[in-house]
Amino acid sequence: LQSSFAHNEEHMGRLGVVIIGLNGAVASTLVAGVALMKKGLVPRRAMLTEPDDAVNAEKLTDLLQFASLEDLVFGGWDLNDESLYEASLKHGVFRADELQEVKAELEAVRPWPAVFSREYAQNLQGRHVVATDGGHRGQIEAIKRDLTTFKEKHGLRRVVLVNLASTEKWMERTAVHETLEGFEKGIESNDPGVSPTMRYMYAANSLGVPHANFAPSLANVPALRIQAENNGVPYCGMDGKTGQTLVKTAMASMLRLRRLMVDGWYSVNFLGNNDGLVLDDPASNQTKIRSKASVLDSVVGHKVENHQVHIHYYKPRGDAKEAWDNIDISGFCGQPMQMKINFLC
């Protein structure tokens, strides 16, 4: 797929990565980690596009002509206007002495005002936000200006957008989501069905910016798919699934291969960061739980009648998320067995 922002050519220099939720735990860790890896201060590990320090490993970046870490340029939006250095210190994933080594690089990156409404995330406060007096259309135009300015400022030929924002409340698909014409009418009428996430994706599609939705918030609706396909814009994603659901899909696949029946699966998550605070709101919690719960039946190949997923905000955990799983299974001749997994991530 080709667009004015993303071309299928050999090597096009630096790649702009714009992030919704730039100062959040995941995004700030990503940017700080890349800065540290560029200086050789931490190992290049646990990435699909890097060789894990193996001398003879083939790099996917070379094979598929992906951008290297050295080519990445970061920008994005956040509800907090502090620098990435301040955000990274606050989240505490990397040690203060490590962050000191890349302080200048991180202090140079400050987020742009974000599109936000408490209607979609009750437990968040928006201090650094795009004005709402222009309605949905005005906010979309502000997003487009930010993307264009970022691209021009850094002399970039290509930009991608990644949604790492906190989870929005659960939304059902309605008529406004079904056609592009209806969606655009919803923009003009400030329809509440056009969420902040959807406004970002619409703006990205308008400029030909490929985008990935790393959050479970509803974005992959027919209207936006039509717009992306009309403009030749690649898109992907519906929740990153890097914690408990990562373990769940791996274990469920193994159980299916060994023909073990899953009788029940009880999952609990504890997290104490801003994402946990957002998920303490029942409306946002429902979005995440539905995303987590939806994966199991399709992987094990049968309906798991006793499948529970719970998410709790527990402030002492901070960014060190913890997941507990209790799995009840039936083995040979129906003999009961049980597995317990505790994943700190």
Annotate each PLM feature.
Residues 48-53, 106, 191-193, 242-244, ...:
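Short C-terminal domain-edge/linker segments immediately following a structured domain
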Residues 211-214, 235-239, 263:
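Short catalytic-loop micro-motif centered on adjacent basic/acidic residues
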Residues 18, 22-25, 87, 233, ...:
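Active-site-lining helix/loop region of Rossmann-like oxidoreductase modules
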Residues 1-215, 219-230, 250-251, 338-345:
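Metallocofactor- and cofactor-centric catalytic cores in central/energy metabolism, strongly enriched
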